[in-house]
Amino acid sequence: MGLLDAKVSNRNVLVTSVDNVMNWARLSSLWPMGFGLACCAIEMMATNASNYDLERFGIFPRSSPRQSDLMIVAGTVTMKMAERVVTLYEQMPEPRYVLSMGSCSNCGGPYWDHGYHVLKGVDRVIPVDVYVPGCPPRPEALIGGLMKIQELIRMEGLGISREEALKKLAEKSVDAQQVLDQTRKAAIA
């Protein structure tokens, strides 16, 4: 027991950093703005329903970009809609995060080859923090993406940039192919 422990052991004292308190407050109260454009919007609405109860994670949907800190782009982004996506993104206060949900918003989806009117990934117009794959992704996948956003917020701080936090998050993430290979080796042995 050190000198500090002896002095604060009988009192209600919390020793932490400002970064930890700010990050805890931000990750415990995410306010997403859903930008539902196609099939993925149906799954996003199902995720917000009572079966999955996002409010237990501190996630409260907002309809205004000025009140939200997370934009969920769900569905096909056309060339004409891209300008509006950028406008809404710019109206969000800092720090702001973007979650791309579904194949269409990630890379153009089935319209990749023949859809001249479809943006080949929303990351061409705004920075994306987390991608949720699927066509359309299940609500569980969206919840997993939201939890990744919360991990990203937890890793950020005054001395750590978002790029550094994203690199740490990518290193921490488990590669699905490695898990499959390990499972196959265990089954063979």
Curated annotation (Swiss-Prot):
One of its GO terms (biological process) is aerobic respiration. Transmembrane segments: none annotated. NDH-1 shuttles electrons from NADH, via FMN and iron-sulfur (Fe-S) centers, to quinones in the respiratory chain. The immediate electron acceptor for the enzyme in this species is believed to be a menaquinone. Couples the redox reaction to proton translocation (for every two electrons transferred, four hydrogen ions are translocated across the cytoplasmic membrane), and thus conserves the redox energy in a proton gradient. It is a peripheral membrane protein. [4Fe-4S] cluster binds at C39, C40, C104, C135. Its cofactor is [4Fe-4S] cluster. It comes from the Bacteria. It is found in: Cell inner membrane. One of its GO terms (cellular component) is respiratory chain complex I. Signal peptide: none annotated. It catalyses: a quinone + NADH + 5 H(+)(in) = a quinol + NAD(+) + 4 H(+)(out). NDH-1 is composed of 14 different subunits. Subunits NuoB, C, D, E, F, and G constitute the peripheral sector of the complex. This is NADH-quinone oxidoreductase subunit B. Gene3D superfamilies: 3.40.50.12280. Its EC number is 7.1.1.-. InterPro entries: NADH_UbQ_OxRdtase-like_20kDa, NADH_UQ_OxRdtase_20Kd_su. Coiled coil: none annotated. Binds 1 [4Fe-4S] cluster. One of its GO terms (molecular function) is 4 iron, 4 sulfur cluster binding. Keywords: 4Fe-4S, Cell inner membrane, Cell membrane, Iron, Iron-sulfur, Membrane, Metal-binding, NAD, Quinone, Translocase, Transport. Belongs to the complex I 20 kDa subunit family.
